[in-house]
């Protein structure tokens, strides 16, 4: 190249071009790409006035305007990418221009739309104001109770008849389309309304569409003339019926979350009851248990009415010695029957408090735990239990392996953020094994914690609910613990939960027996049905292959009718769940969670349905490390098998599209779309199975807290704590921090009005950010540090509300990226014999995706560039 350019170009231009070529090569471009990049640059110099100020502004904003094109590492077809992205930017810029006369009508529509949104936002307050005078009146108060019940019965009967007509009325394709457009229009109108009315309306619309779909499936879509099609169709219909039941029960469960708030305790502390705190442990490391005990010692409660117990089912001498040193009680069993339930029941023989609070050994309570929860027990004498959320300050395997910690609601956020709050409305909150307070008298009446199943917590409160006792839930995190460290441990925990809930369903079915209210029965059944999702999810992941591979019509209907029934059912359910669950579960993430677990919970739940006494309790490991990133091939094997199976379906589908009957082309397309969606979800499951590094023994917790540090010469620096762990802190100094590098300092933290001092070493300094490593602490200093950090009353309060609202389309894009990431990991970690195949496929997809235009990365300086671009 240098010889050719030396011959064609003058020396200064040649030198600059050679420098550009070397820069391209230094950034990883191939010789061909670098040469071609230089050629495109020469053409740009010839035909484009790059020295013009407008072009200079565009070049300055290259990273914002062309985020997917690396100017330092050119690719052969970059000019095509520039052309596509430029057209995209010009279209976007033209849309933002000031409306011209011919577009005034459109501008008027925008104004109407804005006024409509404002009116909808103000509607709930207006309705509340207009009907305020009716709050203390009954519209039918002058009628007898019997007459009111009769009127209510007539209204309900009329509503049911109308609903039955809406569900069962057959429509031709055009009528079905018009009906769906009407419902969709109403949904779009009400979804922006704040308050619960819009959620209730969306539930009604979703149930109408979903019930029509299920009715249509049962009455019009089974092929009774073909045995293979009939069997495959019935299998899919079974899975769809399960999903429909869970959808209906889920809507019922969360239709009106209670959002219970604390009740103040009496000022006279002599009226406060005595409480025993149980911390059961079996094989966990002492360092995991220490923080829980240290935090329990600092709980704001009269010390003469608070007893802390370590329930050591491992019988370890170091635990006994630790309990003696810190002044808590210690119990070790000689026999170990019934695992955790037996351990707690054994301790109940010795503890004499009026209430018992149970914490898993890694759950660190806040100082306010009892003051926030005990007031309700004094107010309601029939209240047997107050449950609070299980909050985790470390990422679970999904969050860590996908890099989504505190960016996307985790798997448990939906349950503890919404479902238990909904259960509380129906008096169906059940015990979750930790972070709860239980009244001793009702617990003693049923013989302590239930031991017949491996989910003893839920079973215990099913029994108490049958006896007429109530339970409560407060959605304010008052303790935090460690999430499971590996995907295999996470799956093992979920297998135990699934087996236990199915055992309860078989041994103490909430649908039968005395004592439960109808709403309680439904809530318990939904909790148990949730863990039966394994087989239906596997059916959905393989269902389209029945048509592609075996020519079995699983839905015996024209492709147009399938689209007119299936898509509205899915879209309405997604829109409604996004409205209800948006803060607690983002759209499409349930498919990822269920797919990862499906293969593993299907066999144990099936076995538990047949033989509920089979199975054993397994302890979930906490506090482990992951030294190196790796693919868990044992866990991911089922996902890879399903991926290969669906890829076979893709190959057969392509062949059938080109060589099959023309009348089936649309059905093949519908099936292929389903297969590609399944491949995306399976790719996400594969991505989760890539274990990311976890080399910190102490997890960092982000928080903002004022503090100060003192040098050995007594000089004080005010600072703000940004994060902390059991071994150190990250702080931000208000001033120059370089002078502290390598020094020994004292960290000053406050708890209430009292100040505590902790010795520390400055480990790193970056600007005004300082990393502190705690020096060896005495036992009392360690207790004080835990109570100043982990056990602060406000440490976890805002975590549940920190997630962004769900946006279904953006969430779908996240899932697409996640699926592709899974296949890239397969290409990276696959055996050499198949690595080449995966690498070619992922490279091909990456190459195609690289041409898709991107939304500019907006900055304050980007706007002039947009204007310059639009003027070229």
Describe the predicted segments one by one:
Residues 463-479:
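Catalytic donor-sugar/metal-binding loop of nucleotide-sugar-dependent glycosyltransferases
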Residues 312-319, 335-336:
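A conserved acidic beta->alpha catalytic loop
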Residues 7, 13-15, 629-872:
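Structured alpha-helical
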Residues 360-364:
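The conserved acidic donor/metal-binding loop of glycosyltransferases
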Residues 253, 331-355, 367-454, 465-466, ...:
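Long helical/loop segments within the catalytic core of UDP-sugar-dependent glycosyltransferases
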Residues 294-305:
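Short, acidic, metal-binding catalytic loop of nucleotide-sugar glycosyltransferases
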Residues 2-271, 523, 533-537, 659-689, ...:
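N-terminal membrane-anchoring/stem segments of glycan-assembly enzymes
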Residues 274-276, 307, 459:
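Cell-envelope/extracellular polymer assembly enzymes that use nucleotide-activated donors
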């Amino acid at each position: 190249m240098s010889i050719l350019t030396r011959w064609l170009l003058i020396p200064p231009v040649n030198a600059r071009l050679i420098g550009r070529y070397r820069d391209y090569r230094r950034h990883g471009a191939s010789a061909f790409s670098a040469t071609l990049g230089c050629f495109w640059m020469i053409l740009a110099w010839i035909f484009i006035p790059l020295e013009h100020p407008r072009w200079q502004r565009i070049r300055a904003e290259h990273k914002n305007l062309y985020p997917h094109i690396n100017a330092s590492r050119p690719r052969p077809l970059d000019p095509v990418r520039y052309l596509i992205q430029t057209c995209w930017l010009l279209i976007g810029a033209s849309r933002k221009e000031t409306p011209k006369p011919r577009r005034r009508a459109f501008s008027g529509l925008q104004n109407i739309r804005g006024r409509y949104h404002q009116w909808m936002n103000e509607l709930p307050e207006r309705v509340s104001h207009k009907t305020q005078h009716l709050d203390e009146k009954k519209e039918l108060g002058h009628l007898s109770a019997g007459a009111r019940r009769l009127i209510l019965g007539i209204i309900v009967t009329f509503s049911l008849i109308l609903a039955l007509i809406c569900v069962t009325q057959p429509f031709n394709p055009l009528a079905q389309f018009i009906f769906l457009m009407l419902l969709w229009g109403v949904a779009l109108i009400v979804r922006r309304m704040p308050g619960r009315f819009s959620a209730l309306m969306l539930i009604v619309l979703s149930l109408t569409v979903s019930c029509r779909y299920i009715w249509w499936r049962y009455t019009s879509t089974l092929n009774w003339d073909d045995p293979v099609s009939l069997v495959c169709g019935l299998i899919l219909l079974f899975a769809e019926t399960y999903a429909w039941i869970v959808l209906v029960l889920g809507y019922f469960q969360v239709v009106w979350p209670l959002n219970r708030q604390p009740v103040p305790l009496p000022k006279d502390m002599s009226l406060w009851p005595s409480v025993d705190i149980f911390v059961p442990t079996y094989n966990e490391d002492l360092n995991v248990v220490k923080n829980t005990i240290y935090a329990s010692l600092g709980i704001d409660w009269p010390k003469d009415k608070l007893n802390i117990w370590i329930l050591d089912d491992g019988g370890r001498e170091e635990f006994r010695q630790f309990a003696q040193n810190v002044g808590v009680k210690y119990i070790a069993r000689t026999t170990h029957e019934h695992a955790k339930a037996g351990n707690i029941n054994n301790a109940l023989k010795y503890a004499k408090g009026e209430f018992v609070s149970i914490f898993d050994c890694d759950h660190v309570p806040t100082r306010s735990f009892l003051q926030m929860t005990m007031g309700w027990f004094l107010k309601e004498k029939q209240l047997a239990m107050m449950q609070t959320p299980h909050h985790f300050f470390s990422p679970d395997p999904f969050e860590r392996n996908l890099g989504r910690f505190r960016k996307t609601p985790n798997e448990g956020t939906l349950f503890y953020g919404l479902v238990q709050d909904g259960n509380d409305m129906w008096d169906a909150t059940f015990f979750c094994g930790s972070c709860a307070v239980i009244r001793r008298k009702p617990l003693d009446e049923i013989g302590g914690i239930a031991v017949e199943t491996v989910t003893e917590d839920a079973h215990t409160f099913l029994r108490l609910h049958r006896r007429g006792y109530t339970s409560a839930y407060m959605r304010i995190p008052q303790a935090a613990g460690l999430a499971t460290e590996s995907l295999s441990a996470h799956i093992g925990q979920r297998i135990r939960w699934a087996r236990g809930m199915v055992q309860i369903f078989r041994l103490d079915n909430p649908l039968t027996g005395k004592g439960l209210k109808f709403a309680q029965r439904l809530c318990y059944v939904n909790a148990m049905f949730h863990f039966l999702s394994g087989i239906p999810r596997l059916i959905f992941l393989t269902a389209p292959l029945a048509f592609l591979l075996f020519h079995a019509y699983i839905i015996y209907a024209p492709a147009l009718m399938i689209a007119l029934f299936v898509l509205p059912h899915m879209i309405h359910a997604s829109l409604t769940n996004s409205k209800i669950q948006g803060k607690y579960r983002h759209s499409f993430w349930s498919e990822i969670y269920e797919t990862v677990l499906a293969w593993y919970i299907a066999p144990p739940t099936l076995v538990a349905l047949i033989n509920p006494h089979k199975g054993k309790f397994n302890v979930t490991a906490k506090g482990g490390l992951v030294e190196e990133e790796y693919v868990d091939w044992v866990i991911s094997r089922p996902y890879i098998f399903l991926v290969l199976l669906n890829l076979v379906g893709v190959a057969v589908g392509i062949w059938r599209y080109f060589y099959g009957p023309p009348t089936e082309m649309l059905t093949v397309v519908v099936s292929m779309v389903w297969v590609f969606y399944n491949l995306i979800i399976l790719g996400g499951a594969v991505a989760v199975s890539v274990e990311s590094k976890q080399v910190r023994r102490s997890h960092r917790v982000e928080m903002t807290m004022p503090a100060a540090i003192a040098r050995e010469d007594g000089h004080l620096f005010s600072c703000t704590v940004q994060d902390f762990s059991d071994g150190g802190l990250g702080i931000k100094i208000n001033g120059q921090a370089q002078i502290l590098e390598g020094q020994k300092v004292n960290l000053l933290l406050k708890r209430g009005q009292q100040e505590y001092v902790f010795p520390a070493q400055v480990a790193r300094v970056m600007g005004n950010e300082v990393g502190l490593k705690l020096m060896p602490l005495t036992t009392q200093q360690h207790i004080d540090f835990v109570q100043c950090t982990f056990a602060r009353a406000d440490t976890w309060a805002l975590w549940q509300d920190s997630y962004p609202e769900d946006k279904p389309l953006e969430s779908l894009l996240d899932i697409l990226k996640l699926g592709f990431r899974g296949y890239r990991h397969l290409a990276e970690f696959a055996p050499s014999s198949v690595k080449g195949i995966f690498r070619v496929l992922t490279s091909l997809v990456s190459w195609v995706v690289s041409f898709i235009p991107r939304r500019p990365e907006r900055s304050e300086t980007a706007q002039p560039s947009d204007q310059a671009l639009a003027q070229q």
